[in-house]
Swiss-Prot record:
Disulfide bonds join 29-73, 39-58, 44-67, 48-69. The lineage of its organism: Eukaryota, Viridiplantae, Streptophyta, Embryophyta, Tracheophyta. One of its GO terms (cellular component) is extracellular region. The keyword Signal applies. This is Putative defensin-like protein 119. InterPro entries: DEFL. PANTHER family: DEFENSIN-LIKE PROTEIN 122-RELATED, DEFENSIN-LIKE PROTEIN 184-RELATED. It comes from the Eukaryota. The keyword Acetylation does not apply. It is found in: Secreted. Residues 1-25 form the signal peptide. One of its GO terms (biological process) is killing of cells of another organism. Belongs to the DEFL family.
Amino acid sequence: MAKSTIFAIFMIVFVLGMVTKETKGQEMCRDLLMRAKNCDDSTCATLCKQKWKGNGSCFPNVYRKSCLCTFPCKT
């Protein structure tokens, strides 16, 4: 009984440590796509997903809408 309790506590601490290691320090990177033409929401999202497995959205820039892609940085 005592061995199984100690083992269970050890496994919980181990799993929590692994989860913390995975999420700690993960930064998000950004890149602008479709600079030469006006942004289309569906095209922007598709390009970002294909290129970086990220999320893309259009935002108003000075003269036109630009595509901003946000994705997890590679370490």
